[in-house]
């Protein structure tokens, strides 16, 4: 940190020696370092033991392990995606490059379209809207790519009522930002930066909480059975056919259920359907079997009109329950992977509690004895006075 140049770009992994997930990431981290070096990338790759370099970890606000952060021109970017080589490399290429990438030809535009499921594009000359767009890009570059182009580069089917404009291309179509209708630009981009239907993992689902939309999920196994395939195709069909009606919904399927298990605080049934409201940590479950498209549409209608109760939430009681559940799940995981550490984490607070109880119990008789002594001391003069023989009077 003291010797780096102002233009240096670093991606750093913060780890703890006892963290099993950090150890699993080690070979991936070495591959990333080797590949970036062979490509001549300006990004330097490093790692830091957060338990030893506590000052550096505090400066980067490391709260969990492994933490992956990027430092570019004094700005720190936190990576919250899957701990895979492809995911991290995409993050590096996105953040290390320009905030807004200019597409100067039809060929470049088509190439970008083929690589990205969602494309945000600014069209027009310099304007206040472009300034806002660039400011949003600086904050949200960790999540998605930002592009700019001239009108003649766009497909001829794209109709723009006026310039400048911001568009999002996804799901085989496009939408144009309208400030009066869509409100704040950043909030609109957060809502629209995901495909309408796609495979969702726990990292993506967590990030979707900022969109403010409900998420319809088909929970399936990795080796999807016939029933799971039926749920997936049902959700995908409704997502495509009723996109305009359910603009406040995202649709997808999940093959990993740890996040949902934590949300409902229990084991989930697979395959099944669930609608989650990530802004309040709530969820909705169908009241019966969902076998047809009409059943799914009735379920979504019940979610919107309030006839189906929202479970969970982020109230105080729910937060306490979820904290207890997460603590138990963490201790179970740690105990299975590091038994000695798990025993210490369980026994240490119990030992402290036992010591406090012992001290309290020991203090009680001492206080009682003191009180008795004080009482005797107060009574003794009175008894002494009462038993004292009367003095005789003499002339």
Language model: regions and residue ranges:
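ER-lumen resident redox/N-glycosylation machinery signature
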Residues: 1-395
């Amino acid at each position: 940190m003291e010797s780096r140049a102002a233009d240096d770009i670093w991606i750093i992994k913060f780890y703890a020696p006892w963290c099993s997930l950090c150890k699993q990431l080690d070979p991936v981290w070495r591959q990333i370092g080797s590949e970036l070096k062979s490509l001549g990338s300006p990004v330097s790759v490093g790692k830091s033991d957060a338990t030893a370099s506590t000052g550096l970890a505090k400066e980067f606000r490391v709260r969990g392990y492994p933490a992956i952060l990027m430092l570019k021109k004094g700005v720190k970017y936190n990576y919250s995606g899957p701990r895979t080589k492809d995911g991290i490399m995409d993050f590096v290429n996105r953040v290390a490059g320009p905030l807004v990438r200019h597409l100067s030809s039809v060929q470049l535009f088509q190439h970008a379209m083929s690589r990205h499921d969602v494309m945000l594009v600014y069209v027009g000359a310099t304007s206040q809207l472009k300034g806002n767009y660039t400011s949003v890009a600086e904050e949200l570059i960790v999540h998605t790519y930002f592009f700019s182009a001239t009108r003649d580069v766009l497909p001829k089917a794209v109709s723009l009522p006026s310039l400048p404009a911001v568009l999002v291309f996804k799901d085989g179509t496009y939408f144009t930002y309208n400030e009066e209708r869509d409100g704040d630009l950043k909030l609109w981009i957060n809502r629209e930066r995901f495909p309408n239907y796609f495979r969702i993992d726990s990292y993506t689902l967590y990030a979707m909480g900022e969109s403010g939309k409900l998420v319809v999920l088909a929970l399936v196994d990795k080796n999807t059975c016939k029933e799971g395939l039926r749920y997936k195709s049902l959700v995908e069909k409704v997502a495509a056919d009723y996109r305009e009606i359910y603009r406040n919904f995202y649709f997808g399927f999940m093959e990993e259920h740890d996040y949902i298990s934590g949300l409902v605080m229990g084991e989930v049934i697979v395959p099944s359907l669930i609608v989650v409201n990530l802004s309040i940590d709530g969820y909705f479950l169908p009241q019966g079997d969902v076998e047809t498209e009409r059943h799914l549409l009735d379920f979504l209608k019940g979610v919107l009109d309030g006839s189906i109760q929202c479970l969970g939430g982020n109230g105080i009681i729910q937060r306490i329950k979820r904290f207890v559940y997460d603590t138990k799940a963490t201790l179970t995981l740690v105990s299975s992977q590091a038994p000695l550490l798990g025993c210490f984490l369980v026994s240490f607070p119990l030992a402290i509690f036992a010591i406090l109880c012992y001290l309290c119990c020991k203090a009680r008789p001492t206080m009682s004895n003191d009180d008795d002594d004080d009482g005797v001391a107060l009574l003794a003069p009175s008894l002494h006075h009462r038993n004292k023989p009367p003095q005789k009077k003499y002339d």
